[in-house]
Amino acid sequence: MLNLKFVRENPEIVKQNIRNKFQDRKLPLVDEVIELAEQARATQTEADELRANRNKLSKQIGALMAQGKKEEAEEVKAKVNADAERLKELEAKESELNARVKEIMMTIPNIIDPSVPIGKDDSENVEIEKFGEPVVPDYEIPYHTDIMEKFNGIDLEAAGKVAGNGFYYLMGDIARLHSAVISYARDFMIDRGFTYCIPPFMIRSNVVTGVMSFDEMDAMMYKIEGEDLYLIGTSEHSMIGKFIDTITPESELPKTLTSYSPCFRKEKGAHGIEERGVYRIHQFEKQEMIVVCKPEESKMWFDKLWQNTVDLFRSLDIPVRTLECCSGDLADLKVKSIDVEAWSPRQKKYFEVGSCSNLGDAQARRLKIRVQDENKKKYFAHTLNNTVVAPPRMLIAFLENNLQADGSVKIPKVLQPYMGGKTEIR
């Protein structure tokens, strides 16, 4: 969410940013919110004047009564009562105006970083760099579920009966591999100085609207019926929420957390949920990382975060590349985002396995996450998040890139301690 003062003083910058994100339908909202904010301010001024006048008249009533001027006191009382009625009207109007201002401000997108390429959707994202040499072996790479089924490692049919499309049972060495990857990712991030965290898997609505846009909320979140609770779509939501309504001394920043959690997503309107396999599903597990830092450090942390993901995948012998997300592919709260994609030898192309985002002060402003410097001055922090690893999507890349000619799957050295010393799955 932008600062209203910034919108009021820079309407053309805000409008151009909206155009850059190809959200022209939102252009009228800029002038509307400025006008509504002005009305709210004028209403507040009138209400403040009435309150001051009421206090003044109340003192007059006491003085008049003391002087025995009861009739005059009653006239002043009538004026006070009339002002009280008008004050109620003004307070209701001010509340209504402020609610509408907040509603609009929540829909106006954050100002994107100048380095973000302009484009309509993910087809216009820009490749930055490749890490590792993509290999296409001279033997066939089966579909990922076929590989898993060979090892009796997945049961989609039973999951479909129990929960419907978008769910799975993992078993045996495939389930063990899934857990091994999560455990390795956890230790990988702890070794890089992040504090390990297991967060709540449900959050309240004020946290949901603090970390994401209404459109994202509708497309992703499962609501608990009869409760003000939602299942998390990613642990970023509850980890960032940990700092709601806090003021952190500048000396205690940055806050760097890495967390494990199950994730639940409706994937409303998402292509692929009906397809066979585990690429796009309603429930999965993920290791995530977040940073809460000073504004001047967020760009530095952004580069560190996505590099962590690249380094982890390379340690597992999986080639990856990074893509700069274009303006139209950025969610409204994001300033800048980079996708990490893994190589698929079967498809002979890359596919998304993680995303790193800098949200500037958008989440902090919504959730009131503030910092206090040594002079007691308070300001909003910057927040960032990044996927460390998200099985089972990551398992697709792992199985394809480590499948051997005889149909066995090689286990990289770094994972072998988490697999009971196994060097391969057969």
Question: Where are the regions a protein language model picked out?
Answer:
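TRNA-recognition modules of translation machinery and tRNA-sensing kinases, especially anticodon-binding
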Residues: 27, 130-426
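N-terminal alpha-helical targeting/anchoring segments
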Residues: 1-134, 149, 153
